[in-house]
From Swiss-Prot:
Keywords: Cell inner membrane, Cell membrane, Membrane, Transmembrane, Transmembrane helix, Transport. Its main location: membrane. The complex is composed of two ATP-binding proteins (GsiA), two transmembrane proteins (GsiC and GsiD) and a solute-binding protein (GsiB). It is found in: Cell inner membrane. GO terms for cellular component: plasma membrane. It is a multi-pass membrane protein. The chain crosses the membrane at residues 9-29, 103-123, 135-155, 169-189, 229-249, 278-298. InterPro entries: BPD_transp_1_N (IPR045621), MetI-like (IPR000515), MetI-like_sf (IPR035906). This is Glutathione transport system permease protein GsiC. Residues 1-8, 124-134, 190-228, 299-306 are cytoplasmic. The gene is gsiC. Residues 30-102, 156-168, 250-277 are periplasmic.
Length: 306
């Protein structure tokens, strides 16, 4: 297992390099001139050219790429073109609000989704199953931005129960986490149901029932452990999706996180911030997949990696 983990970690190097190259080319193909956006609409050509020189945009593309890669290897992603603050500081300041929003969304989505999936599997083809799957399909079908606007209109504007923007208290997390986690809960419910339906028909489940074990204990002890193997994969992928896919939700709720920072950076063509954020999201996905593989072996000792 240790050798497998080390090999996967070493595999990060070429993967991140390829991502770095693609991101660099992508951001430089975006329409618009960062120097003109930063200088302002009333700036003349001389001022814009001066800004370009200050930002290093007057250098050849290959020179900019070498400067970017050589500094990134040392953990230096440069300065933000807009705020002139270190990119690492900008990301660090926005990371925790996004992380806590992701964790909050993931916790309730996993609890609700797995509970709904187990109930639907145990009472298959009956009204609990139909109700759970109807709610799940609705959760998947409803766009995040539309759900967010609906929740704001009902609970903030009409009822005045919850705040709309900010991240200062636990109340601020309720609406964004519900919006962000709705689709994940729906996916978890459907995936858990499918996995549990397969497990409930296995021989060891019938054997446990024949021995007089209560149905609740059969489901929780024998069914849950074996059904969790494919579900853990989905949990890992969904957690990565939440970390990198909170852009729309953060924009709707004006959340001070990485998603909104990325949107603002794209609008202003802030190349260093865009490159650093996408690299960070890529690293998160790779590490989450590695953790999922390790959890595989922890849940099912029969699984071994070489």
């Amino acid at each position: 297992m240790l050798n497998y983990v080390i090999k996967r970690l070493l595999g990060l190097i070429p993967t991140l390099f390829i991502v770095s190259v693609l991101v660099f080319l992508f951001v430089h193909m975006l329409p618009g001139d960062p120097a003109r956006l930063i200088a302002g609409p009333e700036a003349d050509a001389q001022v814009i050219e001066l800004v370009r020189q200050q930002l290093g945009l007057d250098q050849p593309l290959y020179h900019q790429f070498w400067h970017y890669i050589s500094n990134a290897v040392q953990g230096d992603f440069g300065l933000s073109m807009v705020s002139r603050r270190p990119v690492a500081d900008e990301i660090a300041r926005r990371f925790m609000p996004t992380l806590w929003l992701t964790i909050t969304s993931m916790v309730w989505a996993v609890i609700f989704g797995m509970a709904a999936g187990i109930i639907a599997a145990v009472w298959r083809n009956r009204w609990p199953d139909r109700l759970s799957m109807t709610i799940a399909v609705s959760g998947i079908s409803f766009p995040a931005f539309a759900l967010g606007m609906l929740l704001i209109q009902v609970f903030s504007v009409e009822l005045g129960w919850l705040p709309t923007v900010g991240a200062d208290s636990w109340q601020h997390y309720i609406l964004p986490s519900l919006t962000l986690g709705a689709a994940v809960a729906a996916v978890m419910a459907r995936f858990t149901r499918a996995s549990f339906v397969d497990v409930l028909s296995e021989d060891y489940m019938r054997t446990a029932r024949a021995k007089g074990v209560s149905e609740t204990w059969v489901v929780l002890k024998h069914g849950l452990r074996n059904a969790m193997i494919p579900v853990v994969t989905m949990m890992g992928l969904q957690f990565g999706f939440l970390l990198g896919g909170s852009i729309v939700v953060e924009k709707v709720f004006n959340w001070p996180g990485l998603g909104r920072l990325l949107v603002d950076s794209v609008e202003m063509r802030d190349y260093p911030v865009i490159q650093a954020e996408i690299l960070l999201f890529s690293l998160e996905f790779i590490l989450i997949n590695l953790v999922v593989d390790v959890l595989y072996a922890a849940i099912n000792p029969a699984i071994r990696y070489k």
